[in-house]
Amino acid sequence: MDSLADQIRRRRTFAIISHPDAGKTTLTEKLLLYGGAIRLAGAVKGRKAARAATSDWMEIEKQRGISVTTSVMQFEYGGCMVNILDTPGHQDFSEDTYRTLEAADSAVMLIDAAKGVEPQTIKLFQVCRMRGIPIFTFVNKLDREGKDPFALMQEIEDVLGMRTCPMNWPVGMGSTFKGVYDRQKGHVELFDNRDHGQTKARVETTGVDDPALSAVLGEDLHRRLVEEIELLDVAGDPWDFDRFRRGDLSPLFWGSALTNFGVQSFLEYFLKLAPAPAPRLAGDRLVDPEEPRFSAFVFKIQANMNPAHRDRIAFMRIVSGRFERGMDVQHVRLGKKVRLSQPQQFMAQDRQIVEEAYAGDIIGVFDPGIFRIGDTLCTGEPVAFEGIPSFSPEHFARVRFKDAMKSKHFRKGLEELTEEGAIQVFYATQPGHPDPILGAVGELQFEVFQHRMRHEYGVEVILDRLPYEVARWVEGEGYQPRRFWGTDHMAVTDRDGRNVLLFRNEWTMRYVVEQNPGLIFRATAQAR
């Protein structure tokens, strides 16, 4: 049996980040295909027989064809245990993605070859930078016409301030995309796939100097490939593992997730280069993954993964030690012991009971209403990992329900969806305004909230938009909410009773901040 250290060192836990429609869910499906977790990929849009993507499991996701929650998937490949966190690409759900990146040891940045570095990619890249996690880059959709590969490399450096080292190089693009040249192995991988990417691509390998290659590629494409390889060898950044681990250099891969071209070689290089679980700060000390004592933190709560049972699952990232089914752990925030008797691991909504898990793994446990995002669980010496912040919403609305008989269902739905981080809720301090106020990073969150209240809790809700765009958490002894009862701002409290001010715009917010030097205004709130 493998030792604790051996089990932990073979874990690879990563998140995929991208702008919407860069192909993130498709890439996730194809990694699962190559990992043997699924036999037939189903994320091929536009095909009548296409199955719903494995990672897009919520009803609204299937209807809209977008990911709005984080899916957690695990498979074993090449001696490694791989945990994929497939995050929402839509900008309205970036807060869920921020939380998920707290649970990842590395990230795969997916870029559309035709569109280059897009706004949401920039935001998520910056979060990875702040966390100091290594970043892999996968340029996708080479089966379509896109930007020149050298121009894309320059764009990544100019926009993100990060150099790249191509581990492979595309052979053609669009209709002439034939495969990739593996710079480490020195051979060309030619792809053949006749079933729309539903099964693994067939691969033939040959040397770049093979005379037969000209017959396959055509003389012009073959000559251009040789010239580009020579240019890369002279002018490109050499591979440097230390620079990669510091986040200064990103290994760059080219391919097409839709057709599976380049996916397997990317997966194999990823497992070779990606870091095993890293230590995490708890107060004034680092908790090492190989410490024998179990510790974990909750980064996501998902209600109604099985609507028939109205269940709620708390997802936790194991930071150290070994987890065993049925073990008693300390719930640090509540200061009490809890038993984790039904731990589960997931393939999107499909689940199985897990008997044991190790640092780096993601497990889900039944939540009877005692967990919050950011909670720490541990055995032995109590530790408390840093909380996961809430971000300032940019859209606000009062929420009320149509049917007075649904009051209990409304309160339950609002509480559960707030606790899982799907929406933020505030309460006006001014008398006469009893209805809760919802805060969202983007408009689509309101739509998802209404959809889930209707379908999961049986409540029709009405949203009345409010004219505010900025929220700031306020601290300071001199703060008096009634001073801010006006038309340009609103004094509210969040669900933990903390003081918050809502502002019409950035200008109003800056003016109030300048006029109140004795108060502290924060754009984020640390989880309690």
Curated annotation (Swiss-Prot):
Purpose: Increases the formation of ribosomal termination complexes and stimulates activities of RF-1 and RF-2. It binds guanine nucleotides and has strong preference for UGA stop codons. It may interact directly with the ribosome. The stimulation of RF-1 and RF-2 is significantly reduced by GTP and GDP, but not by GMP.
Highest taxon in the source lineage: Bacteria
GO terms, molecular function: GTP binding; GTPase activity; translation release factor activity, codon nonspecific; translation release factor activity, codon specific
One GO BP: regulation of translational termination
Subcellular location: Cytoplasm
Domain spans labelled tr-type G: 9-280
GO cellular component: cytosol
Pfam families, alphabetized: EF-G_D2, GTP_EFTU, RF3_C
Matches recorded under InterPro entries: EF-G-like_DII, EFG_III/V, G_TR_CS, P-loop_NTPase, PrfC, RF3_C, RF3_dom_3_sf, RF3_GTP-bd
Positions that bind GTP: 18-25, 86-90, 140-143
Keywords: Cytoplasm, GTP-binding, Nucleotide-binding, Protein biosynthesis
Similarity field: Belongs to the TRAFAC class translation factor GTPase superfamily. Classic translation factor GTPase family. PrfC subfamily.
Coarse class of the protein's main subcellular location: cytoplasm
Name of the protein described by the UniProt record: Peptide chain release factor 3
